[in-house]
Amino acid sequence: MDLKIFDRMESEVRGYIRSFPVIFSQARGSLLIDEEGNEYIDFFSGAGTLNYGHNNPVFKERLLEYLHSDGVVHGLDMATSAKKRFLETVDRVLLKPRNWQYTLQFTGPTGTNAVEAALKLARQVKGRSNIISFTHGFHGVSGGSLAATANAKFRDAAGVSLGNTTFMPYDGYFGPDVDTIAYIERMLDDPSSGLDKPAAVIVETVQGEGGVNVATLRWLKDLQKLCRRHDMLMIVDDIQVGCGRTGSFFSFEAAGIQPDIITLSKSLSGFGLPMSLVLMKPELDVWKPGAHSGTFRGNNLAFVTATQALETYWSSDAFSNEVQRKERLVRDWLENLAHSYPNAGLAVRGRGLIQGLVATAEPELANRIARKAFERGVVIETSGAQDEVLKLLPALTIEDELLTRGLDLIEASVADALSEEQPAAQVLKFGGKRR
């Protein structure tokens, strides 16, 4: 497959083409097809952008109808029919059933735009500049969001100093027996700790890029209480693990919390169309008209597909229950796999349909597995500080047959990657279930 034009004309910054060195030409559901007709099972989902699969036929039909009717495509922040219907649907499907009140702000098209707006707003509301972020957190690669991102690879590329952020230990950072909330509270209580009082805390309930680190529900509850005690806003970055990835539409719902500000993007449009959104408590809406603008805020094509996604999948609990059923299938399979190779140092963590197979003993193992998986026809990536986590991110709509086939291919890839070092697998069948 000839990739020379990409090598010759595209910047060295390109990344995923190096992991998946083929030319993809088609995609449908959970399958990607390259120019030679080879099929790949997608366990990557555009880094969490395609929760409902590629070219979802329900969304595509509605989008084509809208285009054929000459619906408004570009409208800045003007009132359009597509935006009106989206706002009505958010209110009816997401807010009223939860008895929530949020004001919506449409930012630029990517997740980092939503984070930038959230941080700016928090600083305006509180009149303070410092933000608490967390170890292994990822919030984007533009100025303000990059300052809140912990990964050295991204921070080193900034070229300028990144300030006004204090990093604190995420849940479990020091192990399961250390309460990191108590550590943060001690820092906040001590006037000589050197910690400038923050305007807000920004947190992911599951750190996808950071290595599929999962905050416990109790920790999230305690974090919200901490924010309230110390007059800080709580911002939940739900860009990768929101829109149903953990089983509920918002990833924090199981904790019973209600953040002050929520950022959404990635799978919000449902179709891979750029769209980002900030939800804020109404009393926090202190923006002056036009104070945070952008040419591509409010993507009307994305409004169309996002509305359809909410109506199709989130008008009842049925889809949420289905995601949780698939979570159990994947989790059981991964636990079984980890126990099958007791000397490999494999561990499992995750929530919903973001699950990680962690190579605790040899970080490079995860990348070897990912490469072997791609050779066998599975698109999957790694994450974590040392790329030590094989991150499973299939579409929420993936068919069981395709899901189990992909898992079987990953199992074979694990065996390949370990074959030179590990003894034969001790295959365990938990509860008599087939993997």
UniProtKB/Swiss-Prot annotation:
Family: Belongs to the class-III pyridoxal-phosphate-dependent aminotransferase family.
SUPFAM superfamilies referenced in this protein's UniProt entry, alphabetically: PLP-dependent transferases
Name assigned to this protein: Diaminobutyrate--2-oxoglutarate transaminase
Molecular-function annotations in GO: diaminobutyrate-2-oxoglutarate transaminase activity; diaminobutyrate-pyruvate transaminase activity; pyridoxal phosphate binding
Pathway(s) served: Amine and polyamine biosynthesis; ectoine biosynthesis; L-ectoine from L-aspartate 4-semialdehyde: step 1/3
Requisite cofactors: pyridoxal 5'-phosphate
Transferase listed as a keyword: yes
GO biological process: ectoine biosynthetic process
Protein keywords: Aminotransferase, Pyridoxal phosphate, Transferase
Bilayer-spanning residue ranges: none
Broad enzyme group: transferase
Domain of life of the source: Bacteria
Modified residues (N6-(pyridoxal phosphate)lysine): 266
Family annotation (PROSITE patterns): AA_TRANSFER_CLASS_3
UniProt xrefs under InterPro entries: Aminotrans_3, Aminotrans_3_PPA_site, Dat, Ectoine_EctB, PyrdxlP-dep_Trfase, PyrdxlP-dep_Trfase_major, PyrdxlP-dep_Trfase_small
Keyword Transferase: yes
Gene3D superfamilies: Aspartate Aminotransferase, domain 1, Type I PLP-dependent aspartate aminotransferase-like (Major domain)
